[in-house]
Amino acid sequence: MSVSTESTLRSTSAPHELDLNHAEKLTPQQHGDSTPSDTMPEGGVAAWLTVTGSFIIQFCAFGYSTSFGVYQDFYTREYLTNESSSTISWIGSVNTFLVLGSGIIVGRLFDRGYFYWLLWGGSILTSFSLFMLSLAKPNQFYQIFLSQGLGAGLGSGILYVPSIAIVSQYFRERRALAMTIVSSGSSLGAFLHPLMLNKTINGSLGFANGTRANAGLISGLLLVSCLIMRTRLPPPTHVPELGRAIRGIVRDYAFIFASVGLLIFAIGYYFPLFYLQLDATTRGLDPTFAFYTLVIMNASSFIGRLTPGVLSQYKVPVGNMFAISSGGCAVLIFGMIGIKTDAAFVIFGIIYGFFAGMFVALLGPILSLLTEDIKELGARMGVAYLFTAIGGLLGGPINGALLTGNLVWWRPAVFSGVVTTVATVFFCAMLVVLHLKKRTTPSSSRLTASPTPMEPIEQSHRSQQSTLRKDSYTINGLLPVFWFQF
């Protein structure tokens, strides 16, 4: 296809229907690659080793962070008994905030070609912080906060965005498969880390040796990632200005509704993740069973993350799935008030894990839907994740304060249920704004990229007009992590 044809297509494309799996065809220079876009390796030793390294980083970074519920339980009952549950939750909240919130800065550094600096720097900081955590003494809150909250959180945050972004340098047609493998690392980590931590710090090894064992595992895996991951493209000659993207955000009401909704939703979303195991333990359930509540929830979350990709093949609207998943989480959090038996905890863990995993899987697609200029996608995702991180930072301490030292469980459950319900209203408002914007967009300007790389884009434009009119929100390729194309 000629350059002039590409320019015409870019000028007439509707921003919300751009297929992310094929967007690179339209703007190959955006990544600083001077070679034709059809020269993506789509495999090979270097590509799959990089995917393996990214999988490992997700396992060690976000997979570890989402296992904080084990520490919340252990610190509250045994190791930090002089601190309230609200104070203790600041450790996990700050850790999560840094993992997600640092992306707005780390992403810019990655765009400028500092991948290896970020990879080695984040790995060293994470390893050092976890070994320092093993030296923390009982009832010394500041030692644990500095090592686990700040150190490990910042180290994981430095690794998180680059481990996802690097995969796009090797894959286009098989990017969905590659990204699915990478994203499953965090789910596997959220499943296995609680098992290991409960068996070690609550077992014969104790806190110090158990933490060292976990730190040794993570350090060894991160070293493997550093040795096998490689970049393919040179640093780009031009990086889009962050200020221009932010100015566009201020005028985008749909994105504002989404960002505010994410901030509010995150305040309540992490309540079950941080407190479910402590809830099960303090209600007199068998300790061995209580240790598995997080494992059950995270195993179900893995299934929930795969579900949107399956439903999208049946043209289920992305926006509808997003609102339903947030609403499902809200209803289930209210349900925490009544769970008191083993069976109730199992049922809650399975259903909440499913909806929570589904919500996380849809974050990327819904943010892509809200991005008019594909070159601003990274900046907009950074802003949205920063809002999410702020909500996660506030949620743990607020819920801990409502819980009080007397463990009054209905208070944080009601509060978290209310805020997630309010967030769902914001997400519905976002969909209404998108719908109104669709109605004011001339149908002649709507375009999606070719569904298969072998068909001309012009033919796809003619054949997909009727599909776009029937389904305004289902967008082929907006689920790059879970949409399998071989």
Annotate the PLM regions.
Residues 173-177, 181-233:
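Helix-loop-helix hairpin linking two adjacent transmembrane segments in secondary transporters
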Residues 101-115, 304-318, 403-404:
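Helix-to-loop junctions at the C-terminal end of transmembrane segments
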